[in-house]
């Protein structure tokens, strides 16, 4: 007879396979449209005592999303939901960065040769349309990932009011005296035709000249050190800067030597130069660097005088100890030359070519100068080396780390131009500088991981003044007027406020669309005819660094309060958004705009290599979603240690899919076995129920602590170990007999079901921040006893289980260790084909502690048919745990055709338990 229909087998409509790629889009669409889950999340927690807002670091509105975007937004979504499912009132307003060079370059490509004929207003209009197009594209792509946020009202930096707020912040900084305009060497992208901030520069290996050049000393300088025909030898990697040389800088504290070759070097570096073959090392004379100060050598390229000066920046870690100084091409060069009143010469134009300055300043000899006018500086290197002739002591090539424009990917140069800067070291607040205020503010910020604190602190300590001006079209203008006569900027409150109001109404385009008279307030004391406009625009990092003001302080967005609870971006943003936001906020508010910073690594392939189209190892999030599902991408983020680079590949995603399958099937088993339970019974928990509840309590709380500390990989490690080892590996397995075979309403069956419901209710909100789709699907198909009055995933709140640790008492240890040892022996017996199932066995033990418990429970624990005290001499195996003996004996009973336990007196006869359940004899 087939007894299958008499068993209480599991039943649920929650599918074994998620079919995520097919099903996710439908549920996501419902979240955004019919169910309005973000609005629901706000409404559900509006009376919560604790709030959390994550301020979104804006992605750039250009191009499609890549896997790095997916990592970033998923991690943000998980963290916001970690707070939400803990019962907190959360806010997340996504945003976009819209201004800047990449979009402008796209428009230049579209315009081709017509760019010069196109007005700034038209270019800006096209840039705005381009940004708008990609905001819509990226918004849909983010929503396709199931990211929850205020997608109906995101912040967009090119909105008129937003541009006005950026400008207002600039005005406040100007009025505090921190905005200065001066000519100074800055990173210059000749390919983009604009100045760059430090954050816009990336370093790559570049092959350059390594050249040692001898400058003849003047007669006076020779006489001063008692030499004849002495030569000061400098080392440089940029021969193209030699025409602009104005000085040779020595370290004020070092001793210098004259060698037998008549070369002057720092004594400290002589041995190194001997090894390089630059000198034989024989010292003729030693002297202090100060002896040459304010005397001259002669530039061998153009015979112009080069002044000997002293500077602390001259290090003894390479070169000759005599530093070629061109104040227009280096920051140290500029500052040290300033002290000596040396003129800054700039012979290079915006495009990186020599201009007419090389003629007027006689930077080349007359017979060759025409050849160099209009020549790109990098093409001039070889020709300059040739012209230097015998003055070249040594020349070669070497590879070194060199700054590149991160947008054009072309090498940049240092070039002195007139720019706007935010001063780092000018006192403004109680005598403190912006650098000091910012460093102070960082002390109040929490970092995840903590190493981020040292990184950004070091950067703030060592950074130069912030160059915020750009010579481009698409950005927020530095909308100030100058006095035509004096060229001084005018920071008049009435004018600045009027421009702010105009920008709010018409956008920053008004700066180019309106005449000066139209931009001035009525009855203004300044006359339009005496004024001129500043035509530079703001560094796009100033835009993003001002988002806290426009989003958190303006009242225009329901984004939470200033300061944000968290800023979260990739680790490169220590030098980018984290820093620009800190500086703008410190200048205006004297505080950081964030309470905490969390950083993540970059996505790399399985071998740890950077993703590159040329290498062919790029993984697009859209493809992952189509093949595996977004939920797998989310679990990949949850399982990964985001504090370092995250590896992703097809193989890794398959492994994550397997982990997801285990989680899903565990939940499915739990749901399927409680479908007939109407109310939880807590009075009759068995020892096994109490054991798994205590294990669940420990695992869930450790997981929750890790999640609340944003250590998701640790949390999932603990959780998955519990689900596979304790819950699925032991408890659910041993419960099958009482769930399927006991009477429907037996206390053992109901206590197991009650246990499973309690575990499920706690598990779902715990994993909901990461596996939101899955939990929402679970809630659709879960029986009412699991839902507990809740409608969907967004109604859930994590509440801990509270059960004591079962392993605290001695019996608990004995149970666990003996079971592990028992199943080790079972594996051997099965391999030896002595048994097929543990149900064929009787387990005998000398432990009175174990035998004092309910025997049915103990049988379930070891999954045997009988338990008894030691009595058999004929046994299959024997083992000891804690001085207690255990013997495995073949049962002399028959297999019950219903429950398969060896507890029937006769063949094909039901065991006593099954007879009772079916009411047969």
Curated annotation (Swiss-Prot):
- Catalytic reactions of this protein: tRNA(Ile) + L-isoleucine + ATP = L-isoleucyl-tRNA(Ile) + AMP + diphosphate
Record-listed E.C. numbers:
6.1.1.5
Entry cofactors: Zn(2+)
Its cellular-component GO annotations read:
cytosol
Location in or out of the cell: Cytoplasm
Q: Which Pfam families does its entry note?
A: Anticodon_1, tRNA-synt_1
User: What is the free-text note on the cofactor?
Assistant: Binds 1 zinc ion per subunit.
Q: What class of enzyme is it?
A: ligase
BP-aspect Gene Ontology terms: isoleucyl-tRNA aminoacylation
Q: Which CDD domains match?
A: Anticodon_Ia_Ile_BEm
Q: Do the record's keywords include Coiled coil?
A: no
Keywords (alphabetical) are: Aminoacyl-tRNA synthetase, ATP-binding, Cytoplasm, Ligase, Metal-binding, Nucleotide-binding, Protein biosynthesis, Zinc
Provide the binding site for ATP: 613
* NADP among keywords: no
| Residues that bind L-isoleucyl-5'-AMP | 569
Motif segment ('HIGH' region):
59-69
A GO molecular-function descriptor: isoleucine-tRNA ligase activity
Its predominant location is cytoplasm
Q: Which residues bind Zn(2+)?
A: 896, 899, 911, 914
Residue ranges annotated as motif 'KMSKS' region: 610-614
Question: Which domain of life does the UniProt lineage start with?
Answer: Bacteria
Function per UniProt: Catalyzes the attachment of isoleucine to tRNA(Ile). As IleRS can inadvertently accommodate and process structurally similar amino acids such as valine, to avoid such errors it has two additional distinct tRNA(Ile)-dependent editing activities. One activity is designated as 'pretransfer' editing and involves the hydrolysis of activated Val-AMP. The other activity is designated 'posttransfer' editing and involves deacylation of mischarged Val-tRNA(Ile).
The record's subunit annotation is: Monomer.
Q: What is known of its domains?
A: IleRS has two distinct active sites: one for aminoacylation and one for editing. The misactivated valine is translocated from the active site to the editing site, which sterically excludes the correctly activated isoleucine. The single editing site contains two valyl binding pockets, one specific for each substrate (Val-AMP or Val-tRNA(Ile)).
Q: Which family does it belong to?
A: Belongs to the class-I aminoacyl-tRNA synthetase family. IleS type 1 subfamily.
The entry's protein name is: Isoleucine--tRNA ligase
Species assigned in the record: Campylobacter hominis (strain ATCC BAA-381 / DSM 21671 / CCUG 45161 / LMG 19568 / NCTC 13146 / CH001A)
């Amino acid at each position: 007879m087939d007894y299958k229909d008499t068993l209480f087998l599991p039943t649920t409509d929650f599918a074994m396979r998620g079919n995520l790629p097919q099903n996710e889009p439908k549920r996501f669409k419902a979240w955004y449209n019919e169910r309005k889950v973000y609005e629901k999340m706000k409404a559900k927690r509006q009376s919560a005592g604790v709030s959390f807002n994550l301020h979104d670091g804006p992605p750039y509105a250009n191009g499609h999303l890549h896997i790095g975007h997916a990592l970033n937004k998923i991690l943000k979504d998980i963290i916001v939901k970690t707070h939400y499912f803990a019962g907190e009132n959360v806010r997340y307003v996504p945003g976009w960065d819209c201004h800047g060079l990449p979009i402008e370059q796209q428009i230049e490509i579209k315009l081709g040769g017509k760019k010069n004929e196109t007005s700034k207003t038209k270019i800006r209009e096209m840039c705005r349309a381009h940004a708008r197009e990609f905001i819509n594209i990226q918004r849909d792509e983010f929503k396709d990932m199931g990211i929850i946020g205020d997608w109906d009202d995101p912040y967009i930096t090119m909105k008129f009011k937003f541009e006005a707020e950026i400008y207002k912040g600039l005005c406040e900084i100007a009025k505090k005296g921190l905005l200065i305009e001066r000519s100074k060497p800055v990173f210059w992208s000749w390919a983009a035709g604009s100045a760059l901030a430090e954050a816009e520069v990336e370093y790559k290996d570049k092959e350059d000249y390594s050249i040692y050049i001898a400058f003849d000393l003047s007669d006076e300088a020779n006489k001063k050190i008692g030499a004849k025909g002495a030569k000061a030898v400098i080392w440089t990697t940029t021969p193209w800067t030699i025409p602009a040389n104005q000085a040779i800088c020595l370290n004020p504290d070092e001793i210098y030597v004259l060698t037998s070759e008549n070369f002057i070097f720092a004594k400290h570096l002589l041995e190194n130069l001997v090894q390089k073959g630059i000198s034989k090392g024989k010292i003729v004379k030693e002297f202090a660097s100060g002896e040459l100060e304010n005397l001259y050598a002669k530039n061998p390229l153009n015979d112009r005088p080069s002044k000997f000066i002293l500077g602390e920046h001259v290090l003894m870690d390479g070169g000759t100890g005599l530093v070629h100084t061109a104040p227009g091409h280096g920051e140290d060069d500029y500052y040290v030359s300033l002290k000596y009143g040396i003129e800054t010469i700039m012979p290079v134009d915006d495009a990186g070519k020599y201009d007419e300055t090389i003629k007027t300043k006689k930077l080349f000899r007359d017979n060759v100068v025409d050849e160099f006018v209009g020549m790109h500086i990098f093409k001039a290197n070889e020709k300059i080396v040739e012209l230097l002739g015998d003055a070249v002591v040594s020349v070669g090539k070497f590879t070194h780390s060199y700054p590149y424009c991160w947008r054009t990917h072309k090498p940049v140069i240092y070039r002195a131009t007139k720019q706007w800067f935010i001063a780092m070291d000018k006192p403004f607040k109680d005598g403190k500088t912006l650098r000091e205020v910012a460093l102070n503010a960082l002390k109040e910020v929490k970092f995840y991981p903590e190493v981020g604190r040292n990184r950004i602190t070091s950067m703030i300590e060592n950074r130069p003044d912030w160059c915020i001006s750009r010579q481009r079209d698409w950005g927020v203008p530095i909308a100030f007027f100058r006095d035509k006569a004096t060229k001084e900027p005018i920071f008049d409150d009435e004018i600045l406020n009027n421009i702010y109001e105009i920008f709010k109404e018409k956008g920053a385009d008004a700066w180019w669309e309106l005449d000066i008279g139209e931009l001035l307030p009525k009855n203004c004391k300044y006359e339009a005819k005496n004024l001129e406009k500043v035509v530079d625009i703001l560094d796009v990092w100033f835009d993003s660094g001002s988002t806290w003001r426009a989003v958190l302080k303006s009242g225009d967005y329901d984004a939470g309060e200033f300061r944000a609870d968290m800023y979260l971006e990739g680790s490169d943003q220590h030098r980018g958004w984290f820093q620009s936001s800190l500086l703008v906020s410190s200048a205006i508010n004297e505080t950081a705009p964030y309470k905490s910073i969390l950083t993540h690594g970059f996505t790399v392939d399985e071998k740890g290599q950077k993703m590159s189209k040329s290498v062919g190892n790029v993984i697009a999030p859209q493809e992952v979603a189509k093949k595996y599902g977004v939920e797998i991408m989310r679990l990949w983020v949850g399982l990964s240690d985001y504090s370092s680079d995250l590896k992703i590949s097809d193989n890794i995603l398959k492994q994550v899919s397997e982990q997801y399958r285990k989680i899903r099937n565990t939940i499915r088993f739990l749901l399927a076995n409680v479908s007939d339970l109407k109310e939880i019974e807590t009075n009759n928990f068995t020892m096994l129920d109490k054991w798994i509840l205590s294990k669940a309590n420990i695992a869930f709380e450790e997981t929750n602590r890790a999640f609340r500390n944003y250590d998701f990989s640790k949390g999932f490690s603990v959780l998955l170990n519990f689900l596979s080892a304790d819950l699925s590996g032991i408890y659910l397995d041993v419960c099958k007999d009482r769930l399927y075979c006991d009477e429907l309403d037996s206390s053992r069956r109901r206590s197991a079901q009650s246990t499973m419901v309690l575990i499920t209710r706690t598990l779902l909100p715990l994993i909901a921040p990461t596996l939101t789709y899955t939990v929402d699907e679970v809630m659709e198909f879960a029986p009412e006893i699991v839902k507990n009055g809740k409608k969907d995933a967004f109604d859930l709140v994590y509440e801990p289980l509270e059960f004591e640790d079962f392993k605290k008492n001695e019996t608990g240890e004995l149970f666990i260790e003996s079971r592990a040892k028992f199943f080790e022996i079972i594996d051997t017996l099965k391999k030896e084909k002595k048994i097929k199932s543990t149900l064929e066995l009787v387990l005998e033990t000398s432990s009175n502690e174990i035998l004092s418990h309910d025997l049915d429970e103990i049988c379930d624990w070891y999954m045997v048919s009988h338990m008894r005290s030691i009595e058999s001499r004929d046994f299959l195996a024997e083992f000891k745990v804690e001085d207690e003996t255990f013997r495995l004996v073949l049962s002399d009973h028959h297999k019950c055709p219903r429950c398969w336990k060896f507890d029937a007196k006769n063949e094909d006869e039901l065991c006593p338990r099954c007879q009772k359940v079916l009411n047969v004899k």
